[in-house]
Amino acid sequence: MNRDYLRKVAFGISVDESIPSDPLVWAQNQFDAVPDFIWEKKLPTLDEQRDRYGHWVYQDREVLREKHKNDRLAYEKEKDHLRKITGERFFESLELSVRHSTALASDSPAFERMWHFWGNFFAISEKDFLASFSTGVYQREVIRPNMVNTFEDLVYAVTTSWCMLHHLDNAENIGPNSKEGVRENSDNDKRKVGLNENHARELLELHTLSPEANYTQEDVVEMAKVMTGWRHLWNNKKLEAGPIKFQTEYHEQGPYKILGKVYDIKDFNTVNQGKELKIVIKDLANHPSTRKHIAKKLCQHFVCDEPTDEMIASIVKAWEKNDGNLIEIHKATMETVFQYGLNHRKFSMPELWLLQNAKMLGLFYLYMFPQGFEFKGSKPSRSHKLVKDILWEIGHPIYRAKQPNGYIDLEDEWLSPELIIRRLAAARRFADITNPNVNYDQEYFENVILKNFDHPDNLLKLMKESTFYADRFAVFANSPEVMRA
């Protein structure tokens, strides 16, 4: 049995695939190395996307607005051309298509599920065209490679990435006693600079400790001081899109006191530039509250909304035993799901629901691009945008979370009548993106069900009562068995 397990940790299996003889080993073996993307075309790099973003914001803010300040129509026309040549409306569709192509065709679907988890955990919310240029490549190049390192490594990479630093305004976090802070506050400009706590607060609240650690506002302030100086290099032609560099002239020197521990690194700014952040992150990433917080989030994603202490403890134990090695944490999560998950049902967020239906039913929504596609200076076609459009339709635009805590992975967030109606409508249109080589008759649906469900009787009965072609997709996709894994 254990067919349900394949949906709890991955996306289910297609009718052409074999059920693994040992599902737990099958899942755990996927975490030893980072798998390749299922995409043959060239993918943009972080640096390339920063350059494109820089060209976009500079041309729009500094050139077009001044050039056409008295002609709104001319401004919109030229801005539309700018969108085209920079790919402002192209790259989100590209990144989502890469994500889905890999999820559906990879030999490591459990790894892909875990990547999706971390992408949402270290979310970049909708701000400043980040979804258009940067969020997808940030998840590819910052999060994904670090999934075989330690949690400490992952947090540090995310915290010091251009995308996260820009997202949480750390360029505005300036030490008031730093060289630049003193200079800017001593001139006649009414605008004064100082600490910006955004990034520090999210690092403590969301990415490491959680509020259960009972840290104080003073801890947040001290963390913000540590993080001063981590900022992009300003460029008159790229504005805020310059590379990240620790800049001592903006840094508030210590000592600092965080969670009762004093960090006093002598001559830090001239000897070990920027390394104090790494030292503090090491302590935060290995704090007992962090281990419990992350373990609970993993259980909530893969097992159920209200995980037990026993579930959480099994992941924490692996974390402690392996010094935060993510490979072992991921494997422990798979074992926890195997041990506890089959007695619990987890309501699927919309994207997961879509991917599981696509995998099980063999939906063919990337059929026009068997080798992928790449940016060639044009707007995306309707086919390029298909994945993005479906995600918008079902209320889950992955790269556009409204808050830094990402999308809330709890049933109450997704069980509204409006969102259920959206899924019903989308499922009825699954008939338009089916595999042309498959006959989606009653027998096919029966094979899908028997391959993916340990208790198939109710779903088989529902499908036998669905006589209309389009109805089969809606009934299957929105059945309790498919909505919850």
What are these regions (language model features)?
Residues 1, 6, 87-90, 191-198, ...:
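Short, compositionally biased low-complexity segments
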Residues 1-18, 24, 28-31, 35, ...:
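Flexible, low-complexity segments enriched for small/polar residues
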Residues 4, 52, 57, 74, ...:
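Intrinsically disordered, low-complexity N-terminal regions enriched in serine/proline/glycine
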Residues 5, 13-145, 171, 184-185:
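N-terminal accessory alpha/beta regions
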Residues 19-20, 40-41, 45, 114, ...:
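General "foldedness" signal
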Residues 75-81, 96-99, 131-366:
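Active-site substrate-binding loop specific to GH73 endo-beta-N-acetylglucosaminidase modules
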